[in-house]
């Protein structure tokens, strides 16, 4: 019997699976918190230059000190990065409490020499009592360091994907999950107590590493202990756990206004997750493929007993396990690499088009999700809206993929996302409601695009190199997430350029998706030859295979997409 039947024999949807999946899904909530933590720990508060040192002896109110120290910008607000080179005493009235407001005073103030904030800044602590921006003065000439911090974190996610993927296949899912939980807990704790921005970035890089390890091994352990028929439901549930995690972050951030305590709050639970992870059973499928059949058999018997199938546990033996793994062992024979994604014309076209789709989706998604300050709306409210919109977006795209197909759905969500981002460039800044609605629609479309990506890519890559293909496009997504924060820096030179790039990328990739074949109702390709024959229009052996339905969509996806 195949391994799937062996899993049914020990209980594929019993108490073990319910508890196993539940305990694995809980950490996903906090993974979302780490991914979007920058929105709250790196909020840029309103700020202005501190007063001159010689004003400390003067008996002036805050308003008076600000009046003679900091010039106003075009919007009538105190400038953030400059102050008068010398106090402008003439701006105070004769009684020392109010300005005279005559033309001579105004002209003299305009001609006054300005200087940088050599005595530091004062920050508004109304929204956040403390952030890494106010802690290390990452403003004015240092403002680009904010985006650098997020890029370094995403760099850790990328390196972690490359590192933990191979280690997981070599040493197992459970041990890597334990290491990842501990790494996240320790790195997050150290980040919370960092004494410098450099140390903070180092530990956030560690958090990024851990996040990849958690994602990969969590989904691997889930998918390898459940049957194909419920993988869609479980995969959807896991996705909604991530969405719920975004809302939990808002709740934590609302009550914990200090960045250090907030970072600690989203990191400490991973110590608990580390202890829980000791209970998890290693994947028997991986153990058998790694020639550790005795351990695999022991785990299967343990699962059978946990599910109340004591008689079935007694029937299991090494011979039965070997028979069930014959097919899987034959599929692992042969050597394939990422180069096989580019060696043939049809395969190369699919890979390049999917690379563009994944990169632009992640690029635009994080470009929107990590720049909440620009909307002029309460950051807690906008984060709730941005998180909640994922729920209907994912439902709509699943229905759409069943009705009009994968290709049209993928093209539509990308093009609509790009158009909404570009339209925001035309809306005046004071029309915040319209700007926010367009951004929310765009973010929802990009969340839907992620959902579509996972299914569509898994159906386009042939079985023998599906894991390599999903690994490649996932890497493209992480590169997009790394680049996204740095694009915001171009705003200093051309204010509308980031929006143009964020909006143009998904439109171009949506057009690229037109060149991909439709997969709705078609069988999964098993070999590169299947892909080439399908691309050339010749009749393929695939035509005799059983087609798949949407309910089977994540049968081969969850492991690879982690």
Curated annotation (Swiss-Prot):
<dbReference type="InterPro" id="IPR036259">
    <property type="entry name" value="MFS_trans_sf"/>
</dbReference>
<feature type="topological domain" description="Extracellular">
    <location>
        <begin position="373"/>
        <end position="378"/>
    </location>
</feature>
<dbReference type="InterPro" id="IPR005828">
    <property type="entry name" value="MFS_sugar_transport-like"/>
</dbReference>
<feature type="topological domain" description="Extracellular">
    <location>
        <begin position="196"/>
        <end position="205"/>
    </location>
</feature>
<feature type="transmembrane region" description="Helical">
    <location>
        <begin position="379"/>
        <end position="399"/>
    </location>
</feature>
<feature type="transmembrane region" description="Helical">
    <location>
        <begin position="409"/>
        <end position="429"/>
    </location>
</feature>
<feature type="topological domain" description="Cytoplasmic">
    <location>
        <begin position="282"/>
        <end position="351"/>
    </location>
</feature>
<feature type="topological domain" description="Cytoplasmic">
    <location>
        <begin position="227"/>
        <end position="235"/>
    </location>
</feature>
<feature type="transmembrane region" description="Helical">
    <location>
        <begin position="445"/>
        <end position="465"/>
    </location>
</feature>
<feature type="topological domain" description="Cytoplasmic">
    <location>
        <begin position="1"/>
        <end position="15"/>
    </location>
</feature>
<dbReference type="InterPro" id="IPR020846">
    <property type="entry name" value="MFS_dom"/>
</dbReference>
<feature type="topological domain" description="Extracellular">
    <location>
        <begin position="430"/>
        <end position="444"/>
    </location>
</feature>
<feature type="transmembrane region" description="Helical">
    <location>
        <begin position="148"/>
        <end position="168"/>
    </location>
</feature>
<feature type="transmembrane region" description="Helical">
    <location>
        <begin position="206"/>
        <end position="226"/>
    </location>
</feature>
<feature type="topological domain" description="Cytoplasmic">
    <location>
        <begin position="466"/>
        <end position="468"/>
    </location>
</feature>
<comment type="similarity">
    <text>Belongs to the major facilitator (TC 2.A.1) superfamily. Organic cation transporter (TC 2.A.1.19) family.</text>
</comment>
<keyword id="KW-1003">Cell membrane</keyword>
<feature type="transmembrane region" description="Helical">
    <location>
        <begin position="352"/>
        <end position="372"/>
    </location>
</feature>
<keyword id="KW-1133">Transmembrane helix</keyword>
<keyword id="KW-0812">Transmembrane</keyword>
<protein>
    <recommendedName>
        <fullName>Solute carrier family 22 member 6</fullName>
    </recommendedName>
</protein>
<feature type="transmembrane region" description="Helical">
    <location>
        <begin position="469"/>
        <end position="489"/>
    </location>
</feature>
<keyword id="KW-0472">Membrane</keyword>
<feature type="transmembrane region" description="Helical">
    <location>
        <begin position="236"/>
        <end position="256"/>
    </location>
</feature>
<feature type="topological domain" description="Extracellular">
    <location>
        <begin position="490"/>
        <end position="495"/>
    </location>
</feature>
<feature type="transmembrane region" description="Helical">
    <location>
        <begin position="16"/>
        <end position="36"/>
    </location>
</feature>
<dbReference type="GO" id="GO:0009925">
    <property type="term" value="C:basal plasma membrane"/>
</dbReference>
<feature type="topological domain" description="Extracellular">
    <location>
        <begin position="257"/>
        <end position="260"/>
    </location>
</feature>
<feature type="topological domain" description="Cytoplasmic">
    <location>
        <begin position="169"/>
        <end position="174"/>
    </location>
</feature>
<feature type="transmembrane region" description="Helical">
    <location>
        <begin position="175"/>
        <end position="195"/>
    </location>
</feature>
<feature type="topological domain" description="Cytoplasmic">
    <location>
        <begin position="400"/>
        <end position="408"/>
    </location>
</feature>
<feature type="transmembrane region" description="Helical">
    <location>
        <begin position="496"/>
        <end position="516"/>
    </location>
</feature>
<dbReference type="GO" id="GO:0016323">
    <property type="term" value="C:basolateral plasma membrane"/>
</dbReference>
<feature type="topological domain" description="Cytoplasmic">
    <location>
        <begin position="517"/>
        <end position="562"/>
    </location>
</feature>
<dbReference type="GO" id="GO:0022857">
    <property type="term" value="F:transmembrane transporter activity"/>
</dbReference>
<comment type="function">
    <text>Involved in the renal elimination of endogenous and exogenous organic anions. Functions as organic anion exchanger when the uptake of one molecule of organic anion is coupled with an efflux of one molecule of endogenous dicarboxylic acid (glutarate, ketoglutarate, etc).</text>
</comment>
<feature type="transmembrane region" description="Helical">
    <location>
        <begin position="261"/>
        <end position="281"/>
    </location>
</feature>
<feature type="topological domain" description="Extracellular">
    <location>
        <begin position="37"/>
        <end position="147"/>
    </location>
</feature>
<dbReference type="Pfam" id="PF00083">
    <property type="entry name" value="Sugar_tr"/>
</dbReference>
